[in-house]
Amino acid sequence: MKLCDFEVGLDQPFFLIAGTCVVESEQMTIDTAGRLKEICEKLNVPFIYKSSYDKANRSSGKSFRGLGMDEGLRILGEVKRQLGLPVLTDVHSIDEIEQVASVVDVLQTPAFLCRQTDFIHACARSGKPVNIKKGQFLAPHDMKNVIDKARDAARDAGLSEDRFMACERGVSFGYNNLVSDMRSLAIMRETNAPVVFDATHSVQLPGGQGTSSGGQREFVPVLARAAVATGVAGLFMETHPNPAEAKSDGPNAVPLNRMGALLETLVTLDQAVKRNPFLENDFN
């Protein structure tokens, strides 16, 4: 699959979707994107910057949601203009899609909306690549139905069907907890869509702090290594210059000054894994 200006798949190095959870300010966004660009260029990692203009799914009505669509999209546009990076952001309603698609290179659907057929259809008809997040409540094999919905809508609109990714971000495990089943990554390959692993939301503790979500960022490297060893097309990670001061999802964000070391390990592992054949089908 061609994504932005690079090829993605299990026969290619993993690509990275990374950035802050939410757009907090223009300067911090440009600085964070610039630092990530430097790291990824050094390691030859294809990179898409991500951040949200609005966090519609919040634990509390008093939680910070963002700078608003107009200002958030303007800032993401500056990332493209100043740094030459492709950008991704999530959309939350059908009404937002046209305006968002006019700015960003890749759309993302929130996990909780993966079963909303009209919403998935509308995103697919945008003409943009779409990173479709698997709901925390969904079995991995059920993502085939979601991807098929997107492909059907694209085909009916006369657009390419080869623009959709399936993203794993953990599954609910009791109250206020998520777990990641690495078998899901292999199962989701059966969608014939590139599989992306979200290593930071997978360590989230949803609503775990009462009015906000907690997280266990110390396990991000553990799950990221496991996903790369399993074999993925891409990784998704949120980062922040100072996670303790992040306005959204700080507890599961990777400190920006640790991203380089983490990615260096993951690149080495990815190269070793993809030099050898995947044996899953040989065991049937």
Curated annotation (Swiss-Prot):
Domain of life: Bacteria
Name of the featured protein: 2-dehydro-3-deoxyphosphooctonate aldolase
GO biological process: keto-3-deoxy-D-manno-octulosonic acid biosynthetic process
Catalytic activities: D-arabinose 5-phosphate + phosphoenolpyruvate + H2O = 3-deoxy-alpha-D-manno-2-octulosonate-8-phosphate + phosphate
EC number(s) stated in the UniProt entry for this protein: 2.5.1.55
Coiled-coil portions: none
Keyword Nucleotide-binding: no
Lineage: Bacteria, Pseudomonadati, Pseudomonadota, Betaproteobacteria, Burkholderiales
Pathway involvement of the protein, from the record: Carbohydrate biosynthesis; 3-deoxy-D-manno-octulosonate biosynthesis; 3-deoxy-D-manno-octulosonate from D-ribulose 5-phosphate: step 2/3; Bacterial outer membrane biogenesis; lipopolysaccharide biosynthesis
Record bears the keyword Transferase: yes
Key words of the record: Cytoplasm, Lipopolysaccharide biosynthesis, Transferase
Top-level EC class as recorded in UniProt: transferase
Gene: kdsA
UniProt xrefs under Pfam families: DAHP_synth_1 (PF00793)
Listed GO MF terms: 3-deoxy-8-phosphooctulonate synthase activity
